[in-house]
């Protein structure tokens, strides 16, 4: 990974581990919901990398913590960080909605994504500053028809995947450090579907996926597949906001034109 890539990552990208918590022991239709989540995220950010870990490995009885490893880009990384790390949940199917695999019919322009990000950021600030009436709920729903739920109070410190806390407003937050740090790679868990405190109560009941985002803050903490992807990027004259399709296909880890994950893992 050359200097242009490093500079781009520090100025425009957030590398995040998004843990998913379902209220069922065996989460239903994980592939569908991973597609839904990335579709929601892509409305206000550019998804450069997305790789899921499913709760139940295909062909085995081994259970793991379901998550998404993501590289999200934006021209305003500070606003993206505020929106992303205050994102707490996704409302699942409403009554009558068929959980079928779908793809986005159109790809939003960067200008549209920036507008959506600005709208979410401004709405959150208005809620947190008391300019908009907040109802009695553990979450903020910025619009009635929105599936995204946010923190009732702003997050000040973000947890890294190595268990450290980083001030979301600091310059340090946006640096991908090089030093070696220890990381727990044991992802086998018994409580992968256990929601956070307060998740079981409230108006949404079990019809919700809870998010727990953690920041990848050092190169040594990155998953091997993400390292391969970063090292596979080539220096060229084009901006990294438009990553070469062939590189993505060779690595088989980027979203293919924002159409979602491969259909190889449909059972669930």
UniProtKB/Swiss-Prot annotation:
The keyword Mitochondrion applies. It comes from Saccharomyces cerevisiae (strain ATCC 204508 / S288c). The gene is MSS18. To baculovirus occlusion-derived virus envelope protein E27 (ODV-E27). GO terms for cellular component: mitochondrion. Involved in splicing of intron aI5-beta of the mitochondrial COX1 transcript. One of its GO terms (biological process) is Group I intron splicing. Keywords: Mitochondrion, mRNA processing, mRNA splicing. Present with 861 molecules/cell in log phase SD medium. This is Protein MSS18. It is found in: Mitochondrion. Signal peptide: none annotated.
């Amino acid at each position: 990974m050359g200097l242009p890539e490093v500079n781009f990552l520090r100025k425009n990208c957030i590398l995040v581990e998004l843990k998913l918590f379902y209220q069922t022991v065996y989460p239903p239709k994980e592939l569908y919901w991973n597609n839904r989540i990335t579709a929601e995220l892509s409305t206000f950010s550019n998804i450069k990398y997305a790789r899921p870990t499913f709760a139940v490995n295909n062909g085995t009885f081994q259970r793991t913590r379901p998550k998404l490893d993501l590289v999200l880009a934006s021209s305003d990384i500070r606003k993206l960080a505020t929106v992303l790390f205050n994102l707490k949940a996704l409302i699942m199917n409403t009554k009558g909605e068929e959980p079928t695999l779908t793809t986005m019919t159109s790809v939003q322009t960067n200008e549209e994504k920036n507008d959506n990000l600005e709208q979410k950021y401004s709405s959150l600030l208005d809620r947190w500053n008391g300019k908009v009436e907040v109802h009695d709920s553990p979450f903020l729903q910025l619009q009635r028809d929105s599936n995204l739920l946010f923190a009732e109070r702003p997050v000040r410190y973000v947890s890294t995947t190595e268990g450290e806390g980083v001030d979301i407003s600091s310059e340090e937050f946006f640096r991908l450090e090089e030093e070696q740090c220890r990381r727990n790679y044991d992802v086998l868990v018994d409580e992968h579907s256990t929601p956070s405190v307060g998740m079981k109560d409230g108006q949404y009941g079990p019809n919700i996926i809870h998010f727990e985002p953690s920041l990848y803050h050092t190169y040594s903490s990155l998953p091997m597949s993400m390292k391969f992807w970063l090292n596979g990027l080539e220096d060229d004259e084009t901006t990294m906001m438009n990553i070469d399709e062939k590189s993505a296909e060779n690595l088989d880890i980027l979203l293919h034109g924002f159409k979602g994950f491969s259909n190889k893992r449909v059972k669930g």
